[in-house]
Amino acid sequence: MRGVTLSRSGARRTAIAGGAAATTLLALWAHPPLAGAQSPAAERATAQAIRNIGGERALRNLSSFRLRSTGRTWIFDEGPQPGNSVTPASTFRLTMDYDLRSSGDRVRADYVRNSLGTDRPVSEVIAGRRGFISGVDANGSPAGDKAMTSDRWAAVLREQRLLNPHLILRDVMANPRLATIFPSRSLNGRPHRVLLVRDAVDPLRLYIDARTGRIDRLTTGDHNDNRGDVRTIVDYTGWRSAGSGMRFPRTVTLKQEGQTLHSETRSAVRANAPVSSTRFRFPAGVNATYDRALASRGARTTEWLMTFAHLGFVKDGPATEIAPRVVAPGSTLIQGIPNQSMIVEQQDGIVVVEGALSSPRAEALIAYIRRSFPNKPIRYVTGSHHHADHSGGMRPFVALGARPVVHEVAIPFYQRVFGNKSSRLLRDRLDTSDADANILGVPATGIVTLPDPLRPVQLLAERTEHASTTVLVFVPREGVLFVNGDTYTPGAPAGPGARTLDQTIRANNLAVSWIVGGHGGVVSYAQFQQALAVAPAS
């Protein structure tokens, strides 16, 4: 390739160096073979970018890098109000070793994350196609070791690929046909060449300053179950020497939909730092397996997964386990994962209480409903509040004709969620459906009834600081109340949220027998009252 001239032995070494990324990313999610040689313009842009980070020889000889950084992360759709704003997920300190290997890269990211005012030391460790997590991964959990699921594995690798474009250029140097030239763009008032790099998930665009060769920006796509495909922008500033001829950016910022989700400042970066294999050794008893389908999904929902990991409410894993628990006749709590739903059987159909988490979770629920209640249509799907893990699985039910029922304040938010049918990276039922969402709003005062001759269902608003869009779902025939599970978690100690819940119950004269929720277990109303009696005064 012109501009990056490789000897035969050099080309062989480059192919070996690039093989690690091909093993861990490109080869795992297959694409049709590329045809044709790289154009002269693409060759020039590639050569310019490689020269700026240190040159072809330095990149070819890059065997590892170690960085230390501090930063902050933010998350979509977890704040008190619905909209396009983000709320803080964590602050963090990070020491990371990235070991480039032909048999599959090895990564060890030692974090100290702080999401609820308490430091959580946690390490994400990857060796080839497998990984493990050591430390305190979730808020309130004890320190321990566990296998890393393949979606988290893929998300960790893809995020590091975006934050460190050297990994992308390594692939291009090994296989120049991955890169083509894209029309030039102006960025910050300066002309930039745009190198389009084929990627396992979505094409990567590297913005290269036409005068200096500096890589200033990367753009690509990612997916969010409520927001659909979202544009990801990564900006690099303050390129500095990291030794061995290599240069790395000091500050990296990742944005989606105009909002910053990840910002980090590197205090130290060292290329070709020695890395001990003991740092990647699996703990005794931890056996990770590789799941290709789960990895593919994780790579396409990178920031959704990683921002929840930073927040300390981990959403990794297949989300398909269904564990039914009958609460009362006609009301079945669906457990199996931390985000729960309830199925209410009416005479004329099914009410899905809480379309939680994601489309795969929704599909598992749909399969369960079809097995358990054959020929009964799903008439309604409710959302206890707008937070992503409580609402991300509503779309497939809407595609089947279910009417969504949400707080009236959240209607504009859900209109955007259900109106988006343009996803490419992860298409769900609604993307291929002509169904319209006839949203039913729950007012701030009063009760909305989903009528049925046998088992009507009622919804009413609950005022909480957690989310302005909170609603309760009540089945009066058996006295079953479904709560959001955040402000009060059934079975957990009662806090201020439990007291306001009790006030709402009493103000609306609800004859409650059982309380279940989006998280937690099943408690009787008597047990709830006992928990309130021993709770500290707020």
PLM feature spans:
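Bacterial N-terminal signal peptides that target proteins for export
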Residues: R2-A22, W29-A30
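Flexible, processing/modification-adjacent segments and terminal tails
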Residues: Q38-R44, R51, G117-D119, V125-L204, ...
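N-terminal mature ectodomain segment of secretory-pathway/periplasmic proteins
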Residues: Q48-R51, G55-G140, T180-P183, S359
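Gly/Pro-enriched, hydrophobic low-complexity segments
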Residues: L187-G285, F474-P476, V483-N484, T489-N508
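Zn-dependent metallo-beta-lactamase
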Residues: A268-Q347
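Conserved beta-strand hairpin/beta-sheet module of binuclear metal-dependent hydrolase folds
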Residues: R325-R371, T470-Y488
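Active-site metal-binding motif and surrounding structural segment of the metallo-beta-lactamase
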Residues: P360-V405, A507-S513
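Divalent-metal (often Zn2+) His-rich catalytic cores of metallo-beta-lactamase-fold enzymes
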Residues: D502-S538
